[in-house]
């Protein structure tokens, strides 16, 4: 099988699908777990009003919570994976809905935890630690809760907010169902008149084509279709930011951004400093755009020209087997213990590889490491898909290490560090590929791909982050997120980030309609900060070898045992300063010079 043929789910060869029996042997076993989980709310209720009574009671509560968290994580993971493998399957959509409803019910049942732990006097808590040494395992979780005391409400209010959690998922669910299951696009033709099937999954690969006619036709057809439903897309985004504002206001935060970042202990200035630092380096992006126009030899550079490789015909078809082999070679620098787990993941079907009809687009790794994470791909047998593979396996290895070496309550790393391991893998792969070739054409192609990573990860994700910040401010001021308002703001940002050399086609004003991460609550900025951190970490690994790898494994195994900025500081990267972003973009400038010299 290859990435060109899109089959119904039932016809995809088993070896290219994930084996969810590692979580539950069958759907029936999952349903048995559904019934078993219904017993927990009563057990949890027995602790209400009692967490401050004794050290033993508090320890017993945390032990029960760990048990529930592991079981619910596996329960939701199974249903979500089943749903995402074919979002048009109503049975698994129902299973997913039941999973989230159950998780919300259990979260609501334990909603008294935060306020009760907040109410324990400092001297009483100190006595608890002395009386019950096992509570030390939970000190970090307790400290995180008590740090947010000003934003925790009464038990009654916390229960209401917890119950509202399922409603808050509606914008994302609506977008996902509409965009992935219901949207259909017209076929498009290339320069030879051959017909191509346009889907959300084939859209970007078409924009990478050397056939400019195909690129333009796909670009215009995709956004024409999106434009027909622009008000639906705007409505879901409006609902998303209204619910973020509701929760931010309820918890007495100054903004939706502050509310989002406070949970993960990331200072707001890290977000705004990123935008400022990238603004200060836009000249390098403009140089890149000018170089791309020159090399492509076009009179006008359009938005449908930004994905196609600059070096014509340098890309080669890379099968999934080849991609796995190269990934193992590139990541061997991280040690045999690291690659042994990768090989286990490949051989034991932790991955769902190819696109099928109705499958969720894009790629992701599940955040649950019990028994192990799963990875969804839509592999296309090209270089970009190989980078996606190592990216998602970076997530998988981060999750695997944290769940293996951390107790349950500190195993889940926060999103601020979530993209570091994945991006570090990409950079190690790029360095590996560049180190294998002296061919000027191939080297130029790889450097251009590296430059595109800077463009797509550091610049583009910062542009998304700035757009997300603007949407948050609109919602906070009471302004509706209408199609016209969103498109005007997005087009203005596109012009700012790409500069005057790029033609910002009218269609690109609707790109916000296709970005699922806008429903992830200020997530995308971390791609940019993580890329900057990953550049520094990969350089250290390649420069120092074993000592750096040892520190890196500690980072991977750190979960949320420390504040995320501190975990990175232990690797020598201080994201509270603009230095990592500026250093990464200095490398971007150097790569532009090298590519220019190679291509003359």
Locate the predicted segments by residue.
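C-terminal, non-catalytic "cap/extension" segments appended to globular domains
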Residues: 10-14, 21, 25, 113, ...
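Active-site recognition of the HExxH zinc-binding catalytic motif
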Residues: 252, 380-400, 422, 427, ...
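Catalytic zinc-binding patch centered on the HExxH motif and its immediate surroundings
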Residues: 316-318, 351-371
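Short pre-active-site segment immediately N-terminal to the catalytic Zn-binding motif
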Residues: 316-318, 368-390
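Conserved helix-loop functional segments at active or binding sites
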Residues: 329, 333-340, 366, 395, ...
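Post-HExxH zinc-binding segment in Zn-dependent metallohydrolases
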Residues: 413-442, 450-452, 456, 530
């Amino acid at each position: 099988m290859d990435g060109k043929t899109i089959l119904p789910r039932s016809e995809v060869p088993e070896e290219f699908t994930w084996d969810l029996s590692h979580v539950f042997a069958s759907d029936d076993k999952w349903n048995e777990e559904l019934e078993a989980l219904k017993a927990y709310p009563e057990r949890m209720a027995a602790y209400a009003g009692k967490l401050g009574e004794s050290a033993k009671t508090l320890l017993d509560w945390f032990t029960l919570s760990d048990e529930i968290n592991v079981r619910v994580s596996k329960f939701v993971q199974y249903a979500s994976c089943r749903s995402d493998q074919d979002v048009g399957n109503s049975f698994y959509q129902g299973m997913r809905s039941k999973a989230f409803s159950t998780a919300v019910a259990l979260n609501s049942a334990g909603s008294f935890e935060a306020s009760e732990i907040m109410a324990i006097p400092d001297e009483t808590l100190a006595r608890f630690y002395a009386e019950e040494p096992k509570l030390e395992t939970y000190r970090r979780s307790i400290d995180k809760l008590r740090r947010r005391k000003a934003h925790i409400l009464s038990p009654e209010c916390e229960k209401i907010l917890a119950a509202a959690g399922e409603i808050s998922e509606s914008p994302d669910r609506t977008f996902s169902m509409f965009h992935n299951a219901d949207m259909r696009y017209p076929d498009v033709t290339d320069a030879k008149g051959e017909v191509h099937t346009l889907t959300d999954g084939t859209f970007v690969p078409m924009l990478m084509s050397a056939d400019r006619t195909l690129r333009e036709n796909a670009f215009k057809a995709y956004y024409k279709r999106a434009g027909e439903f622009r008000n639906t897309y705007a409505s879901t985004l409006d609902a998303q930011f209204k619910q973020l504002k509701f929760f931010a206001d309820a918890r007495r935060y100054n903004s939706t951004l502050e509310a989002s970042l406070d949970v993960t202990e990331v200072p707001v200035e890290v977000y705004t400093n990123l935008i400022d630092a990238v603004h200060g380096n836009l000249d390098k992006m403009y140089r890149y755009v000018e170089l791309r126009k020159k090399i492509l030899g076009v009179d006008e550079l359009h938005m449908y020209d930004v994905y196609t490789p600059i070096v014509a015909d340098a890309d080669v078809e890379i099968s999934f087997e080849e991609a796995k082999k190269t990934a193992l070679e590139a990541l061997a620098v991280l040690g045999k213990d690291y690659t042994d787990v990768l090989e286990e993941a490949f051989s034991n079907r932790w991955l769902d590889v190819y696109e099928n009809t109705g499958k969720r687009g894009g790629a992701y790794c599940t955040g649950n490491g019990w028994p192990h994470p799963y990875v969804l791909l839509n592999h296309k047998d090209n270089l970009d898909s190989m980078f996606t593979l190592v990216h998602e396996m970076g997530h998988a290895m981060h999750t695997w290490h944290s769940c293996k070496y951390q107790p349950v309550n500190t195993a889940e790393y926060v999103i601020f560090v979530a993209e570091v391991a994945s991006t570090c893998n990409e950079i190690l792969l790029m360095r590996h590929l560049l180190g294998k070739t002296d061919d000027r054409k191939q080297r130029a192609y790889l450097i251009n791909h590296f430059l595109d990573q800077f463009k797509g990860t550091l610049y583009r994700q910062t542009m998304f982050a700035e757009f997300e910040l603007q949407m948050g401010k609109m919602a906070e001021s009471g302004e509706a997120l209408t199609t016209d308002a969103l498109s005007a703001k997005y087009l203005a940002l596109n012009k700012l980030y790409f500069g005057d050399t790029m033609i910002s086609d009218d269609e690109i004003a609707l790109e916000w309609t296709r970005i699922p991460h806008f429903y992830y609550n200020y997530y995308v900025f971390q791609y940019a900060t993580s890329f900057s951190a990953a550049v520094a970490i990969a350089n250290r690994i390649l420069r120092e070898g074993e000592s750096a790898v040892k520190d890196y494994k500690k980072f991977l195994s750190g979960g949320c045992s420390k504040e995320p900025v501190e975990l990175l500081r232990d690797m020598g990267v201080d994201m509270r300063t603009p230095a990592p972003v500026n250093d990464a973009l200095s490398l971007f400038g150097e790569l532009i010079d090298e590519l220019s010299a190679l291509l003359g």
